[in-house]
Amino acid sequence: MKKICIVASKYYEDIINMLVSGVNDVLNNHKKKIKTKIIYVPGVFEIPYAISKNLKKYDAFIALGCVIKGETPHFDFISKSSIDAIIKLSIESKKPIGNGILTCLNKNQAIERADKSNKNKGKEAANAAIELLINDN
């Protein structure tokens, strides 16, 4: 049985709950049995650390978070450094990491991208991780 760890930021809890729900829909409806665990971290910046710490325990990961642009460059630093770290972890560990981290200009954009009746990026991240894991691409 394959094991997938969902690592989700607690920041913007309403958005994260929508993303987690989308991931759960995909995982619960998948043909093959997949064991899952969810780990919550304070923010997007902590997601790579949690993945790194758990690399040996899981076959794949799904990263969920939300960064909304404010008035300072904080958005740019957090978004880029977190995504770069996740990509590096995936390449070096040769383990799939579905990216469900939203980087939005405002909360309405985040809601739109997390809405299950719309584009839910959590679903997309779960599908990507599963496809790479199951097909061993």
Model-derived features with residue positions:
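Short beta-strand segments at enzyme active-site cores
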Residues: I38, A60-L64, P96-L102
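Glycine-rich phosphate/diphosphate-binding loop of Rossmann-like nucleotide-binding domains
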Residues: K2-I38, P42
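Glycine-rich phosphate-binding loop
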Residues: Y49-I86
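A charged, well-structured terminal subsegment
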Residues: N118-N137
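Phosphate-binding/catalytic loops
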Residues: L105-N120
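Short, ordered loop/turn segments at secondary-structure junctions
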Residues: K10-Y11, C66-V67, L102-N106
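Short, acidic/small-residue loops that bind anionic groups at enzyme active sites
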Residues: D76-T103
